[in-house]
Amino acid sequence: MKKIKIGIIIALVLSFSYGITAAKPAPQEIDKVVFIHYPVPQGQGAYWFPAKAPAPTDQNTKYKYSGIHWAVPYVEYLVNPSGAPPESESAINASFDAWQSAPGDIIFEYQGATSISGSVLDYGNVVSWGNITEDYPGAIAVTVVWYYRGIKEIVDVDTIMNSGDPWAVNAGVVDPDAETGNAGYYDVQNIMTHEAGHWLMLGDLYQWDTQKLTMYGYGALDELRKRTLGAGDKLGIDRIY
């Protein structure tokens, strides 16, 4: 009888141990989303003007969200200033601040400069400049988001601004004391505020009446309006966080 009891106890211990091992979560598969920011289409037929569409306004409440998100509302990021115009880091910080100041509980924390560039899954979040024309012809900027496919949690985000394009801090703002202004440039803060929306997984909007929202999908030279979030941008971030 003693041997039988011992055997039963051992069997129960092994069964319990096996149950713990089997309960370990399976490895998560990682997938990615690529957001490509293109210039405003030019030429005849570039836009469709609906006869009864409402006029574009920053009070438009539209937004697009896929369900992918950060596990916690705290995101650290680095900036590679190589190839960027002077004072770009301050402009980029202001871009993230626009979302941090919106409804919702998202916190962005600047961790300083880095030499890392490009888009690599290294579990670090980086803004850099690089020539992306070959891979993304005509693109102003590209943001790549890696995430766990099963639980839809973000693990890494990188934005690359196209170094082949003209960039300036305060683009289009003419200094009255200077002979020339910054006309004919993409504004760093304007474009990066849009890209920061992708860091939070808000998608691009292309409807006619969304042109004055930050998440409108096209960018333009000397444009500044994306620096300030519209109603739909704020509603989107408030829903996620």
Regions found by a protein language model. Name each.
Residues 1-6:
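Positively charged n-region of N-terminal signal peptides that target proteins for export
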Residues 9-17:
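Bacterial N-terminal signal peptides
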Residues 18-87, 143-151:
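Disordered inhibitory propeptide/activation segment of secreted metzincin zinc metalloprotease zymogens
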Residues 24, 147-151, 155-172, 183-186, ...:
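Metalloprotease/metallohydrolase-associated module, dominated by Zn2+-dependent proteases
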Residues 71-81, 170-178, 213-217:
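Short, conserved helix/loop micro-motifs enriched in His/Cys and acidic residues
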Residues 85-90, 227, 231:
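Generic detection of long, well-ordered alpha-helical segments
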Residues 88-193, 199:
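Metzincin-family zinc-dependent endopeptidase catalytic domain
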